[in-house]
C-alpha cells in the first residue's frame, strides 16, 4: 500500500518516479494474450513519446486528446502528456464524430492520440494525429529537435479535462488537477489493498475517471499489472 509519505507530492511525476524505482522489472501493462510491458519499459516509452510530442511543438499547458478503447498504451500516452506539463483530454470511445468535434472545439484541443479504429471520426481541424498503437505520427510536422526541457509539475496543475457521457445533454468538460486524481488513487486503497503480485483485468473505458483512478492508477501505484482485452 502506497501513501503520500512514499510519493512526497500528489503529482503524476511523483507517482511515475516512485513506481519505476520500486517496481522496475515487474510487469505493468499488457494485453491478455500479449507480453507485458515492465515499469522500466513503460518509463522509456513515456520518454520516447515525450520527445516526439516536443518535436511536434507541444509545450506545458497544451492540450492533447486521447481517443481510444482501453489498451496498454493509453496509460503510457497519459503519463507522457501530463508529466511534461501538458493537459490530457480523454474522450469516450463511443463518442460520435460530432461529439468528438464539439469536445475538441470546446477544450481548444488540436492534437490527438487515437486508435486506428476511431481515426475516421477525428475532424480535419486536428493538426497533429498520432496512432496509439505505436505512437507513429499520421498527421503533423516536427518543428524542432531535441528533448523537452525538465518540467516540475505542481499538485494544483490541471492534469485532465474530462468530458461527461452527456446523459442529460451535451458533454460537459471538467478540469481535474494532479492532486485530484492521484489523491483518489491513494484513497481507493482503503477499499482494496493492492500489492505488486496482483493482476487486474480492465474492461471499462479509461476515459472514465473511476476506471482511470481505481482500475489503472491504483494498480500502477502499487506495482501490480493491468491487463486489457484485444479487439
Question: Predicted segments — roles?
Answer:
Residues 68-79, 94-98, 204-221:
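Conserved coil-to-alpha-helix start sites within the AMP-binding
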Residues 117-155:
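ANL superfamily adenylate-forming
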Residues 93-122, 184-201:
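Conserved ATP-dependent adenylate/AMP-binding module captured primarily in the ANL superfamily
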Residues 8, 17, 25-71, 75-79, ...:
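Conserved AMP-binding/adenylate-forming core of the ANL superfamily
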Residues 38-40, 159-185:
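Conserved AMP-binding A3 loop
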Residues 85:
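Structured binding elements
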Residues 24-27, 145-163, 170, 193-199:
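Conserved pre-ATP/AMP-binding loop-to-beta segment of ANL
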Residues 182-199, 206-231:
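Conserved AMP-binding/adenylation subdomain of ANL enzymes
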Amino acid at each position: 500500500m502506497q501513501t503520500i509519505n512514499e510519493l512526497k507530492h500528489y503529482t503524476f511525476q511523483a507517482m511515475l518516479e516512485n513506481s519505476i524505482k520500486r517496481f522496475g522489472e515487474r510487469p505493468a501493462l499488457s494485453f491478455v494474450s500479449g507480453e507485458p510491458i515492465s515499469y522500466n519499459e513503460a518509463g522509456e516509452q513515456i520518454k520516447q513519446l515525450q520527445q516526439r510530442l516536443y518535436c511536434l511543438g507541444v509545450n506545458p499547458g497544451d492540450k492533447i486528446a486521447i481517443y481510444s478503447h482501453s489498451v496498454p498504451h493509453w496509460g503510457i500516452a497519459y503519463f507522457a502528456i501530463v508529466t511534461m506539463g501538458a493537459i490530457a483530454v480523454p474522450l469516450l470511445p463511443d463518442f460520435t464524430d460530432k461529439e468528438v468535434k464539439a469536445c475538441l472545439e470546446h477544450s481548444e484541443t488540436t492534437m490527438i492520440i487515437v486508435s486506428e479504429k476511431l481515426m475516421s471520426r477525428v475532424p480535419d481541424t486536428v493538426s497533429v494525429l498520432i496512432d496509439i498503437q505505436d505512437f507513429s505520427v499520421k498527421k503533423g510536422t516536427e518543428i524542432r529537435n531535441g528533448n523537452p526541457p525538465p518540467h516540475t509539475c505542481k499538485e494544483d496543475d490541471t492534469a485532465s479535462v474530462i468530458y461527461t457521457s452527456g446523459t442529460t445533454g451535451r458533454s460537459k468538460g471538467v478540469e481535474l488537477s494532479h492532486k485530484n486524481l492521484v489523491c483518489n488513487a491513494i484513497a481507493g486503497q482503503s477499499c482494496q489493498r493492492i500489492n505488486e503480485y496482483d493482476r487486474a483485468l480492465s474492461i471499462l473505458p479509461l476515459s472514465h475517471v473511476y476506471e482511470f483512478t481505481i482500475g489503472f492508477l491504483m494498480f500502477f501505484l502499487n506495482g501490480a499489472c493491468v491487463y486489457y482485452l484485444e479487439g
